[in-house]
Amino acid sequence: MRLWFCLSFLIILCVEHFPGTLAVERNVPESEEKTEQFLRDLFEISRLQRRPAGFTPFRGKFHSQSLRGLSETKRIYNAIWPCKHCNKCKPGLLCKK
């Protein structure tokens, strides 16, 4: 009986120390901890990579055209309406204030 107990104890001890199914099944808390750490790291990465307001990831021909269109619209607006600050400046000129 003692021999059986010693052998079973040694077998369980060996299985625990070497990678195997029993060791994996008994390592549930460690794997949960790794999962939680992974989720915390993922949250931190996504928090650091947040984009500022108004940022567009779209680049290329159409993006530069839309920027060009904005400047043309601003020029047309300044040519038609007087200065916003004093309403006395001539259209198209920069305000001195």
Curated annotation (Swiss-Prot):
Keywords: Amphibian defense peptide, Cleavage on pair of basic residues, G-protein coupled receptor impairing toxin, Repeat, Secreted, Signal, Toxin, Vasoactive, Vasodilator
Pfam families according to UniProt: Bradykinin
Keyword Secreted part of the UniProt annotation: yes
Signal peptide (residue range): 1-23
Subcellular location: Secreted
Tissue expression: Expressed by the skin glands.
One GO process term, biological-process aspect: regulation of insulin secretion
GO cellular component: extracellular region
GO molecular function: hormone activity; toxin activity
Family: Belongs to the bradykinin-related peptide family.
Function, in words: [Ala3,Thr6]bradykinin: produces in vitro relaxation of rat arterial smooth muscle and constriction of intestinal smooth muscle. Possesses insulin-releasing activity. May target bradykinin receptors (BDKRB).
Protein name: Kininogen-1
Organism: Bombina variegata (Yellow-bellied toad)
